[in-house]
Amino acid sequence: MAKGKANLNLTYEAAIGRLEEVVRSLETGEASLDESLKLFQEGIGLVRHCHSQLDAYEAKVQRLIETPDGAAVVEERRTEEGE
């Protein structure tokens, strides 16, 4: 994969794996400023890609849990941040 660009054909799991690699590389502090910026840009692209995939999966799950009369059974999601 080209540095600085997220591969949008990656599975969610592969994208998370690559994101973990990017984070480890940035945490070492051994990359040059230019390389760090490229890694950061790649990481942002991977995060956006993963978020998009999760949104799509959430929509699919929502369709699957609709009741036969067309009403959706939705439970409020709770997060640690109180969103």
Swiss-Prot record:
Gene3D superfamilies: Exonuclease VII, small subunit. Its EC number is 3.1.11.6. The keyword ATP-binding does not apply. One of its GO terms (molecular function) is exodeoxyribonuclease VII activity. Keywords: Cytoplasm, Exonuclease, Hydrolase, Nuclease. Bidirectionally degrades single-stranded DNA into large acid-insoluble oligonucleotides, which are then degraded further into small acid-soluble oligonucleotides. This is Exodeoxyribonuclease 7 small subunit. The lineage of its organism: Bacteria, Bacillati, Bacillota, Clostridia, Eubacteriales.
